[in-house]
Each structure stands twice: as C-alpha cells, then as structure tokens.
Amino acid sequence: RPHVHPPPEHQPPLEHPPPEYQPPHEKPPHVHPPPEYQPPYQKPPHEKSPYEPPPQEYQPPHEKPPQVKPPSEYQPPHEKPPHEHPPPEYQPPHEKP
C-alpha cells in the first residue's frame, strides 16, 4: 500500500508551469536593431542632391498662374450680357429715316 504513488493529477500542474510566468518573448524585439542606425547608410543618396536642385530652380517661374482662369468659366452671369442688347432684326426700321 505505501507504494501507492500519489494521484497524477497533482503532478501535472507542477510539470507545466502556468503560461503567465512565460516571459513576453522579450528577445524577438532585440533582433531588429534601432532604426537610428539605418539613417547613416541613407546619406550616400545625398550626393545626388547636387544635381537635383538645378531643375528645381527652373520651376520658380510657375507659369501655371493661368490656371486661376478656369474658375472664370464657372461665372454663369456671363449669359446675361447677350440679353441686354435686343435682336438687331428690330433695328432695320431705324435705317430708313
């Protein structure tokens, strides 16, 4: 009888510790280094900038200002002027004194 091993139900809990105790995987984040270290390698492209600025100086002219005219087309009032002058057909009589 003494050899009766205790109930296995009591042993399983001890074998697998609660998952809450498991660390939150702090190691994965360590794999990716800080992004601050990457900018240094982006500096090389900066050398191209010297030739890029020239083209930008040519844009200042901005001859697109005419684009502001488009809104003018939206002015429906323009249709009224034609109404002001009556049809010339009624003027013929005026030609004969």
UniProtKB/Swiss-Prot annotation:
Annotated Basic and acidic residues bias: 76-97
Induction of synthesis: During nodulation in legume roots after Rhizobium infection.
Chain intervals for the UniProt region annotation (Disordered): 1-97
UniProt function note: Involved in early stages of root nodule development.
UniProt-listed GO biological process terms: nodulation
Species in which this protein is naturally found: Medicago sativa (Alfalfa)
Name of the protein in question: Early nodulin-75
Keywords assigned: Nodulation, Repeat
Biased composition (Pro residues): 9-22, 31-43
Signal peptide (residue range): none
Family in the record: Belongs to the nodulin 75 family.
Disulfide bonds: none
